[in-house]
Amino acid sequence: MGLSPSAPAVAVQASNASASPPSGCPMHEGKMKGCPVNTEPSGPTCEKKTYSVPAHQERAYEYVECPIRGTAAENKENLDPSNLMPPPNQTPAPDQPFALSTVREESSIPRADSEKKWVYPSEQMFWNAMLKKGWKWKDEDISQKDMYNIIRIHNQNNEQAWKEILKWEALHAAECPCGPSLIRFGGKAKEYSPRARIRSWMGYELPFDRHDWIINRCGTEVRYVIDYYDGGEVNKDYQFTILDVRPALDSLSAVWDRMKVAWWRWTS
């Protein structure tokens, strides 16, 4: 979904949102129409805004593997019809030591102003993104298997983050019956949040990464801060990160949510 080495997010904007799921794949044949709770919403509860599509999400479904067929679309199906070339971020680097998968996995995270979901980067996209940020693969002992594991961990971190956001958003289920969707997100690895700095002063470690996720709550933009902490050894589900997810204190509503949850945790 994102494309930075730490835990990826790029918000390059574009206007082409014509990507469609791979043909013949049952998982993408149906499309949700409207709000599942209220099919003809009125008023602010299901208000929609128009958001531009991040470049790395364009044509993303062309690389999503169909679980029935077991293989991704290849060759001509993946070429840009305008120049018969694959998208640049799926092109192997000139000195790349081994081949990497271009298959992309669909997330469970709804994309704002769309019936589609966000799609995670492929191994090749992740590799290219790291190179672009100055990473030197020759300085690392890295293999194809390592890249596979990196993608699995990255995807699991994002799924875990969204689950935590949904817990907070449950406080607003009445005002937003359609549920939230993700507009954009970005990494701020070295911009430690006040909460992280206070924890550090108390003797705890600083997070190894930070993301800010901007969600659409039925017409209202809400920012969430996510601090990523090392949780030790990676388990079989590729989970090793401890996430501290909470709404940013950008509004009285967010302050009230934080106060309520803090009280519940204190008294439970």
From Swiss-Prot:
Q: Indicate where this protein resides in the cell.
A: Mitochondrion inner membrane; Membrane
At the top level, the lineage of the source is: Eukaryota
Where a lipid (N-myristoyl glycine) is covalently attached, the residues are G2
Q: GO cellular-component terms in the record?
A: cytosol; membrane; mitochondrial inner membrane; mitochondrion
**Which GO terms of type biological process are on file?**
animal organ morphogenesis; cytochrome c-heme linkage; respiratory electron transport chain
Region Disordered, as annotated, extends over: 1-25
The record's EC number reads: 4.4.1.17
- Keyword Transport included in the entry's annotation: no
Write out the ranges of the repeats annotated as HRM.
24-29, 34-39
Catalytic activity, as annotated: holo-[cytochrome c] = apo-[cytochrome c] + heme b
Keywords annotated in UniProt: Disease variant, Heme, Iron, Lipoprotein, Lyase, Membrane, Metal-binding, Microphthalmia, Mitochondrion, Mitochondrion inner membrane, Myristate, Repeat
Positions with biased composition (Low complexity): 1-22
Q: Which GO terms describe its molecular function?
A: heme binding; holocytochrome-c synthase activity; metal ion binding
Q: What is the first-listed, main subcellular location in coarse terms?
A: mitochondrion
- How is it placed in the membrane, per its record? Lipid-anchor
Q: Which Pfam families match?
A: Cyto_heme_lyase (PF01265)
Family membership, please give it. Belongs to the cytochrome c-type heme lyase family.
Write down the PANTHER family for this protein, in alphabetical order: CYTOCHROME C1 HEME LYASE (PTHR12743), HOLOCYTOCHROME C-TYPE SYNTHASE (PTHR12743:SF0)
Which disorder is it associated with?
A: Linear skin defects with multiple congenital anomalies 1: A disorder characterized by dermal, ocular, neurological and cardiac abnormalities. LSDMCA1 main features are unilateral or bilateral microphthalmia, linear skin defects in affected females, and in utero lethality for males. Skin defects are limited to the face and neck, consisting of areas of aplastic skin that heal with age to form hyperpigmented areas.
Functional summary from the UniProt entry:
Lyase that catalyzes the covalent linking of the heme group to the cytochrome C apoprotein to produce the mature functional cytochrome.
Q: What name does the UniProt record give this protein?
A: Holocytochrome c-type synthase
Gene source species? Homo sapiens
